[in-house]
Amino acid sequence: MEERTGEVPGMPELSQETERRGAVLPLGLAEVTGPSMVPTLYHGDRLVVQYGARVRPGDVVVLRHPFQQDLLVVKRAAERREGGWWVLGDNAYAGGDSTDYGTVPEELILGKVWFRYRPRPAGRRSPLAVARWVLSAARPVLSDRSASRRLRAR
């Protein structure tokens, strides 16, 4: 049976290639759709996800949406609360995080994002454009320990 993904406006949907193999191979690939993690992640970014990884506050995680569990989303784990994780998008204006659906149970957190790859934009072939892309295309996704400070400011 094939995993299907739905669309929720403003929600970064992930189309994953290896979620089912996560139990055998702890690394998988995913693709971001949606604006809620801008400026950290953009629509079209490819992610390397470690399934079953230990999550700490500030980590970017892949999770099942609490109300639509066939939809995978990517958010930042802001803090652990009673009943699971409080997750937030890096783009405060996009919504679609724990401010909408509350605490996410631990069993819905699938893995931690370690690395992102940004595909080369079509039509940009000048040497300067290619050089800029080469320098920024692949980056580690770092934990942001200041997410808890952002949480207190809300």
Predicted regions: what is each one?
Residues M1-R154:
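Extended hydrophobic leader/signal-anchor segments used for secretion and membrane insertion
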